[in-house]
Amino acid sequence: WFDDAALFACAVLAAWRAGARVLLLPNTARENIGWGETADIFLTDNLVHKQAWHLPECLAQAQRQPENGRQPENWSVPADAEAHLKTSGSSGKAQIIIKTAAQMQAEAQTLAAALPFGRNGEAVIGSVSPQHLYGFTFRFALALTMGWTMERAQAVYPENLLAATAAHRQAVWI
């Protein structure tokens, strides 16, 4: 579970690059934490579970390590990398939806073609978490595909949406 959309994006891309299957919890309810524990590793940016790898601590640890000057030649993500999204169940029983990296990129490109901003868009501001199906599509895939700014915090209240929007020339709300 991630509150910070940028840390979420880093974790998803790193997991995909490593060949891991990503489970996106819709919230931190006990049932969903249990589902998350079926993964090989549970990454988060908050302390929702004591066995989780708290990403800010991992990043701080990594920064203390000696630097490796070599960079991988290819940072690409496999097209068949999977994200498993669990719906909230608000319209019945929660369901698991599987999206591949290729599907997410295709969805993002289709959305980008429909929006009036093109590559000149400024930011994606979300009232939903990046783990949500719409958040994953807009706050993650669309922002990364188009090179737009990803507002890190979820705008829980309307005044948060307005404040975040004021900082950008153009913004997409989700």
Segments predicted by a language model, with ranges:
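Conserved G/P- and acidic residue-centered "switch" motifs that form tight phosphate/ATP-binding loops
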Residues: 19, 90, 147
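Conserved pre-ATP/AMP-binding loop-to-beta segment of ANL
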Residues: 57, 61-86, 117-124
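AMP-binding/adenylate-forming
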Residues: 39-47, 98-114, 119-174
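Conserved AMP-binding A3 loop
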Residues: 74, 80-109
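Conserved AMP-binding/adenylate-forming
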Residues: 1-28, 122-130
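Active-site regions of enzymes building and remodeling cell-envelope glycoconjugates
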Residues: 20, 39-42, 47-65
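Short, charged/polar "capping" segments at the starts of alpha-helices
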Residues: 7-8, 30-34, 47-53
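A short, well-structured beta->alpha microelement
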Residues: 21-35, 154-162
